[in-house]
Amino acid sequence: METHIGSVDGAAAAADNGAVGCPASAVGCPMTSARPAPVSAGEASLGRHLARRLVQVGVSDVFAVPGDFNLTLLDHLIAEPGLRLVGCCNELNAGYAADGYARARGVGACAVTFTVGGLSVLNAIAGAYSENLPVICIAGGPNSNDYGTNRILHHTIGLPDFSQELRCFQTVTCHQAVVTNLEDAHEQIDTAIATALRESKPVYLSISCNLPGLPHPTFSRDPVPFFLAPRLSNKMGLEAAVEATVEFLNKAVKPVLVGGPKLRVAKAGKAFVDLVDASGYAYAVMPSAKGLVPETHPHFIGTYWGAVSTAFCAEIVESADAYLFAGPIFNDYSSVGYSFLLKKDKAIIVQPERVIVGNGPAFGCVMMKEFLSELAKRVNKNTTAYENYKRIFVPEGQPLESEPNEPLRVNVLFKHVQKMLNSDSAVIAETGDSWFNCQKLKLPEGCGYEFQMQYGSIGWSVGALLGYAQGAKDKRVIACIGDGSFQVTAQDVSTMIRCAQNSIIFLINNGGYTIEVEIHDGPYNVIKNWNYTGLVDAIHNGEGKCWTSKVKCEEELTEAIGMALGEKKDCLCFIEVIAHKDDTSKELLEWGSRVSAANSRPPNPQ
């Protein structure tokens, strides 16, 4: 049960540590050493200590935007073997990239400058907090001598109080540390990193700009491996929770299981599948849990998303007389405007450290992974719900065949995306109609899938794609991005080319913010059309490997995909798909109307 983070292999040396950005070859970093090499007394600086600790927990890429308060720190991060500095176009994308990297690797890091950089990355860190991702946000701070004086510094709002950035981060991180002296710097750094890993949340670490190059005896010692004390269940509480749940489920006629997004933070995906195997229950996932458990299991029935669930899934879940939700998040988006047809007295809610059984007892200090494992040993086999699903299930039809040179429909696009998926691929779905179209994709074993549902920040996918692809070198990542979202964060396609990534981006150009149109339409949802392939070609500028294509019909799409998977397989492939402005999934139409109704509820009587 003990977790020694120091046993996580460090990354091999980057080929070009001298420049901010990925090495020209961008070859993946094989993990080689369990512990960073000891440094000499002359190298025992604060900056190198931080770099070594990042490598030790599995970070081999730090997404950064340089600024005068963090330049010396960046020098020391670059000097660390095994640590790459990936220079991003802006701080928001650096934060999104750290988010995507944490999804692929388990932990991510970004480095920005004081206040102007920190407040720019804040939105991305809030998103990582909402998704329970350990991201270490490092900010270069003012000279330690300036704290406590009446000096007014640049990159501030003109006050001698330098705490504005810290106060902003207090609400979106689980731990904050401001390092202004060397005496306890090692302890502050280690505590921040350990807290991020333990809580699975972002942390904020500010380091005064005059400290990274300074040595201190605490930095020359061989660092103690991180030790995260495991969270253990209260044995009596665990036994009582299992007993109450077994009684609840065993008397049900057609119970079902539903996996939620907190399976990730609880590291309970395998325990959930083991429970499926032991119980024989039909199981579904909430939309934000897609990709966390296998979809190739015979008892998988799809995505449960209320009125916009995949075919026949909602009927089975909502007609069950008992449903166990493992790690759910019920918000207005996931509940389709609070329109779920679920009853509390039929539900068992299992959170990472808590179990609630129907209208009855709640059991605290019960770890989800341990609870599901114990439950699997005692629950009776019951395949009734799955057998009901098989009786009513009708295989999904195919989109209508396209006429020659017929304008491309979005459902035809996703028919072809489905054929591209395998165990060596991953899908990034941007906020918008891609949420709904990608939910219908059937993921092969080992195929990754990520999207940001709780926070739902448009533009997230561009930076997240950069970070995920950098962290998962063994996968070819396919991103589905709307034109409105792309306009928010497009610049870091540049960084993808610089890092020699070979992701495939489908840019769906339908002329506006389609998801907003279906919630509440207005002229503000119409955007200026760009020449998207021309933009990416300009960013490419003949440097690195990048290929673009603009497609308007199925024949052109088929040809473009063939090129992306064949001749251009080593290139970043950008395929602009021209779609009609009203070409949306039926799920978005239904979801949008229900969320709109929830948003427009009148005030309660006072």
Swiss-Prot record:
Cellular-component GO terms for this entry: cytosol
Annotated residues for binding of substrate: D68, H155, E516
Cofactor field: a metal cation; thiamine diphosphate
Superkingdom of the organism of origin: Eukaryota
Entry EC number(s): 4.1.1.1
Co-factor remark: Binds 1 metal ion per subunit. Binds 1 thiamine pyrophosphate per subunit.
Pfam families recorded: TPP_enzyme_C, TPP_enzyme_M, TPP_enzyme_N
Region (Thiamine pyrophosphate binding): 433-515
Catalytic activity: a 2-oxocarboxylate + H(+) = an aldehyde + CO2
Major enzyme class: lyase
Assigned keywords, A-Z: Decarboxylase, Lyase, Magnesium, Metal-binding, Thiamine pyrophosphate
InterPro entries according to UniProt: DHS-like_NAD/FAD-binding_dom (IPR029035), PDC/IPDC-like (IPR012110), THDP-binding (IPR029061), Thiamin_PyroP_enz_cen_dom (IPR012000), Thiamin_PyroP_enz_TPP-bd_dom (IPR012001), TPP_enzyme_TPP-bd (IPR011766), TPP_PDC_IPDC (IPR047214), TPP_PYR_PDC_IPDC-like (IPR047213)
GO BP terms, alphabetized: aromatic amino acid family catabolic process to alcohol via Ehrlich pathway
Entry's family note: Belongs to the TPP enzyme family.
Complexes and interactors: Homotetramer.
Protein name as annotated: Pyruvate decarboxylase 2
Organism per entry: Oryza sativa subsp. indica
Gene for this chain: PDC2
